[in-house]
């Protein structure tokens, strides 16, 4: 009987910890559709992104397109708040994002810097297809 109580308590604590983690880091599943992040991400890759409290130059992030509500893009952070963007303007609470393959990439070069509020999360790892499973870090 005592062993059951311990097992139940452990399971309850694990459930609470998992719920807290999901709520705090808000994981989301991402399917890569375009080729703008080649060779880092290929069309058909599936990845997991978590809400990011702090960004670093080189992070791969999910952002909402500034002109298309609800349309998300996967890009790389090249300039952070406090930097001077390639267009010569200072970035206060904004980031500059670009695709790894500039050909055909819809990114800050076309729509400018993004408010931090449009950054949805940081891509942590690719989980599909099996031959491409790996963690992603800043480049």
Which functions belong to the PLM regions below?
Residues 1-139:
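Extended hydrophobic leader/signal-anchor segments used for secretion and membrane insertion
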């Amino acid at each position: 009987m005592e062993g059951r109580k311990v097992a139940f308590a452990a399971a309850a604590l694990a459930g609470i910890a998992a719920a807290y983690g999901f709520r705090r880091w808000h994981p989301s599943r991402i399917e890569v559709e375009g080729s703008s992040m080649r060779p880092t991400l290929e069309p058909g890759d599936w990845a997991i992104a978590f809400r990011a409290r702090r960004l670093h130059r080189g992070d791969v992030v999910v952002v909402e397109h500034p002109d298309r509500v609800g349309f998300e893009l996967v890009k790389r952070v090249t300039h952070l708040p406090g930097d001077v963007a390639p267009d010569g303007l200072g970035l206060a609470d904004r980031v500059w994002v670009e695709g790894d393959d500039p050909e055909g990439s819809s990114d800050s070069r076309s729509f400018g810097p993004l408010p931090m509020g449009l950054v949805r999360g940081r891509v942590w790892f690719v989980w599909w297809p099996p031959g491409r499973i790996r963690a992603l870090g800043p480049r």
